[in-house]
Amino acid sequence: MEIIYGNILAESIKSSMKQKIDDIRAQKKRLPLLSVVLVGNNPASMSYVRGKEKACSSIGMLQKTIRLDENVSQEELSNVIMELNLDPEVDGILVQMPLPEHLDETAALELIDPQKDVDGLHPMNAGCLLTNRPGFIPCTPQGVMAMLDSIGYKDLSGKRAVVCGRSNLVGKPVALLLQNRNATVTIVHSKTPNIEQIASQADVLIVAMGVSQMVNENWVKEGAVVIDVGINRVNGKLVGDCDFESVAKKASYVSPVPKGVGPMTVCMLLSNTLDAYKMHTQGE
């Protein structure tokens, strides 16, 4: 059994991006800029934003966080997003979720210019993914696919993939990406009967249920690849949706939590922002 360390893979990809940004700087061109909109003082959100700020800094990418009061109105939030849409210096826009309850998250996401939607959550980018056209792919699913790339799982013809979870953020986009690579894909979720039996037929098992250590060796086919997308806090420790020690008995590859998908998500956000920059500066 081998462990797919997302943190090591992310550092390798970030090193390549840093070189590209160093080249841009050497040519005295403007640098890529990611703008993050943070509403309120949610400790988890603030921690995630700090992680993004640190990651941008590590590769020389510019980053600006717009902090708004938790009582901000929908109109004020909309105005901030529209200003960022019109700012030619801004390449990527990310609205940190969750927003306070009085704000409409969907309306905020739909306001972002699809060409600056580096989180890949705008309906237009979702449509591009559905129809296999170029567009921004959500960062966590993109990170999962990069992890599969790293072990040579680029063409999944003849492979059966099972995705545990059907969220718009992870489950659905991962299923589409696997399908685009010729895998035969099944999505299971909390209402699926015999979920363990279905999962145990998978050559590639992607787990994104949001239930700590739910998946054990009984869910895993001998020699399967298991990617654990779950992030749960239990007794002050971060754990995934898989019981790592149990799953490792049968899997050929497994991703850990922490040091797995999490670092890859942030890495893909930077990658999308760099791609947006290239699109915005074409012909300059």
Show the residue positions of the predicted features.
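Rossmann-fold NAD(P)-binding glycine/threonine-rich loop
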Residues: T106-H122, A126, G230-T281
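Glycine-rich phosphate/diphosphate-binding loop of Rossmann-like nucleotide-binding domains
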Residues: V39-E53, G135-V225, K237-E245
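Short beta-strand segments enriched in small/hydrophobic residues
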Residues: L31-G40
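Short beta-strand elements in bilobed, periplasmic/extracellular small-molecule ligand-binding domains
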Residues: C56-E70, V185-I187
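Anion-binding alpha/beta catalytic cores of soluble intermediary-metabolism enzymes, centered on
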Residues: V95-L156
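Short, well-structured alpha-helical segments in soluble
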Residues: E76-P88
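Short glycine-/small-residue-rich Rossmann-like dinucleotide-binding loops
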Residues: P98, A208-V211, G230-I231
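Positively charged, low-complexity intrinsically disordered leader regions
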Residues: M1-K28
